[in-house]
Each structure stands twice: as structure tokens, then as C-alpha cells.
Amino acid sequence: MATLHAYFDPANYSLFFVLGVLTHVFIFRRGEWDLHVFNILQAFAVLESSLVYIVTRAVQAQGLSLWKVTTISSCFTLSTLMGLLISILMYRSWFHRLRRFPGPFCARLSNLYITFRAFKKNRLYEEVQQLHRRYGDIVRIGPNELSIIDPHALRALHSNSSPCTKGPWYSVEHPIKALQMTRDKEEHAYRRKAWDLAFSSKALREYEARVAGYTTQLVDQIEASQSTPIDASLWFNFYSFDVMGDLAFGRTFDMLKNGTAHPFMELVHSNMLTAGSLSHLPWIFPLLKRIPLLNQKTLEFQGWLKQQVDWRQKNNPDLPDVFSWILSDYDALDKPTAQDTINLRGDAQLIAVAGSDTTAASLSCLFSELAVNPETCLNLQRELDQYHAEHDKPDHLSLSKLRYLQACIDESMRLYPAIPSGLQRMTPPEGLDIGNTYLPGDTIVTIPTYTFNRDERLFTHADKFIPERWTTKKELTKDPSNFVPFSIGQYSCVGKQLGLMETRFVASQILVKYNVRLAHEDVARDFVAGLRDGFTLAMPSLSLVFTQRTT
């Protein structure tokens, strides 16, 4: 029978400490464990319970209390955890394959560092920009993550020929796997076929009348409140969510008509801000989904989404919408699995969210810049006046040929990218060369779009709104191919043309009828200061005044 003294022998604690080190070296040092965090916690709980049982049986003749037994076993468990933690920290600090890349020392140790910076003001894109100014083109912002603004990186990471895959962040919604979150290249290519049909030129022509109808509703609201300040970003959100609600679920949210936010929009904005702030801690999402109270909004949202999809499956719209193509692909399956059904709901969510948040952001930032730059706005209005003089009714094909309108849209998207912190990728196991720099395999890499788009090496006067850089002053853009607001390659934005259609319709219909100005001189400053990084760019209030044009 073991004595009590034996259990406090330092050799026993050393044994468990070494066990923790070996657990890191041979298990956790390899692969992705983010989705298994709950199982890992369960494993340590089982370890603790087993140790309590073993120690109890071993010293039962000595009549120790449960408290003392638990204390002994907990010390063993803590020794294991200490070994694990110290091994992780030492490895990340001095032995990790990314040790030669510059960056804050704390970023080497844990993703908590970059998460803290993200939470400070919800403006991670500015935090990363500051890091690049200090450390250069390639910055280690996490234990296994690099942020890169080297121009060579764009095609190396995102082109069709890139060997990179999507990073761990794309698993945060597990088990939901919308098209955007699909990491397997073959599966993504297969599922994307239905989406390509949904956004083909033929399909877009069928959506055009509905987009025009919602644009008219938006203009009517501006007409009703002209010459008085309105929150333009709020109304642009109403517009984009109404459009995508129609195209995703076969029925609108009626926010333009009612002038009030639908709970769906509020849930989306709340969830996106949380997701953006915690994007570098993918392991925390499985925990949040399982913890009562903390998962309440998620459960409400998923319940509401299920109701919408169930209703849409039973009610075919008179006119085809985006979801018609996705649903047709689902119905073609011989025996849809439970995962197929979950993915269908994820795709419905993707249609409604991806096309609404980004379009609202594009419109808000565009009109903010036009209000600040009246000469630019006047030049655009001249182009639109000529267009409307030659066309009885606007259509997307002809609107897409307006050079200055597109230049203003492009310049706005350059300064205020819809996904300011960029898209996560994972290098292939064999690694990847970026220019003259070798990136080790299985490394998380991101091009921070906001910082990249404001790089003076790529764009002269990079922080200024100059639409002419895309038309008459092309020398201000060193290489136009570095501007990819909808990304490139097989993962590029499938809804690009629909988003542009909405933006072009709204800008052309409003500016041909109204002048736009800031409600007061601090609006532009407050707007830029209020932008937030919620994976997509989240909009603050934008108080604008629209007045009827007299000429």
C-alpha cells in the first residue's frame, strides 16, 4: 500500500510534467485541434476523475478525506498541464518554423495577443497596418500565422494555380458548411457549379427587375425625407437586406417599407462583430455553441433560419431567385444526408448575409466619399445625366459601361474593402515561395486587404479618394491587377455582378435626382472613426442630406 508521503514525491510530479511535454510534442504539435477543444476538455476531466479514483484506492487504508485525495490528483493534473503549457510556449518562442519572421514577441506565444488588439476598438485592420509599418512586409501575428503585404503574395495565395487551401477559420461554423466555408477544393468546385448558374448573365437579368424595384423604394424614402438628415448607412442596409431576403428566401424583410430593422439584420450584425473579433481563436467557437446562455442568440438564429428554409422549400416563387438554383441542386441528390440539409441552410444564410452586408458597406462608403468630394460627385452626375438622356430606362448592362461610375465604385472599395482584414489561407505541406521568401508548410497566411490597398508602392496617394486613377490618371495605379475587391481564383466572390448591379442602380438613380452633402462637418470624420471590423466592414451611422437637383 502506497504511503501518503509517496504521492508528494517530486518524482511523481516530474513524471506527469514530462507526460504533458510528450503530449505536446507527439500530439498537439501537429494537425488542427480547434474543432476538438470540447473533447480535449473532456479528456482532461476524465484524467482528473481517473486520478481521483486511483489515488483513493491506493491510500484508502489511511482514511484520507475526499478533499485531500482530490488535491493530490489535481496536483498531478496541473503538473501535466504545466508540462504541456511550458512545452508549447518554449516551442513557439524559439523552435517554431516561423521563428525567423519578425513580429511582437507575445504574438509568438498565443493568438490571444492579436485577439486582444482586435477587441480594443474592433478595428483589427488598423492594428495590423501598424504592425506592418513597424515590422515590414511579412509579420508574424500569431504562433502559426503570418500577415503579408508583399505584392508577390496575391497570386501566390489566391490565384487558380495556387496550391494554398482555406485556413482553420473556415471551420468555425462546423457542422454548417456553406459554399464560402468549404475548405476541400474538389467539394468546393462541385458545389460552386450551382452558384455559377445562379449568378450567370441569364440569371442576373431575371433578378434585375427586382433590384430595380427595391431601388425605387429606396429613392422614394429619400424623396420623403429630402432636405432633412437621414442615416444613409441604415437605409442602405435596409435596401441590401431586402434584396437578398427576396433572392434567398423568396420574400422580402420589408425594411424599406416599414423603416425599421428586422431582427435578422440585427442578429447578423451582432454575430459578425463577434466572429470578427474572435476570428483568430477558432477553437472558442465550438465552446460558445455548447455553453447555455452564451449560445442563445446562435440557437435563435439557426432556428429562424431553419424556418425560412423550410418555408422556401414548400413555396416556389413566381420568379426564380438565387436559392432556386441551390435548392434544385439539393433536390437532385438521390438521398440527401443530414449534412446536405445543414449545408443547404448554410447556403441560404450565405446568400442573405454575404450579399447584404458587403453591398451596404460599399454604398455607405461610396456616398460618404461623394459627400466629402463635391467636385467628384458633380463629375459623376454629369456622366449620369448624359446616360439618362440616352436611355429611357436604366439597365445593368449599359450601367456597367459607365467608366466614371465604375471608377468611383472601385476607388471606394479600394479605400474601404468589404473584408478589411483579408481572407485566410493555408500554405501546402511543402511550403511556398513568395518572391525571395520561403513560407514553411501548413502556415496560416493572410493578405490584410485594407493595408494592401493603401500601400504607396501600389497606389500613389494611396489614402486619397481619386477615381481618376482608374480613368484619366492611370499612372497613380502602379499595377491595376493588384486591385481585386472580389478576390481572385476559384474562391473569388460568386455574387460579384449582383453586388455591382445593386450599387450601380442605387448610385445612378439617386445621384441623377439629388445632390448629397454631409449633415454637419463632423459626419465624415465620425463615420470613418466608427467603422468596425466584423470580418466584413461594419457601418456606423452616416448622416447625409439629399436635396433635389435644380439643373
From Swiss-Prot:
Enzyme class: oxidoreductase
Keyword Acetylation set for record: no
Pathway: Secondary metabolite biosynthesis
Domain of life: Eukaryota
Record's note on what induces expression: Expressed during infection of barley and Brachypodium.
Glycosylation site positions: 258
This protein's name: Cytochrome P450 monooxygenase FCK2
Organism: Fusarium pseudograminearum (strain CS3096)
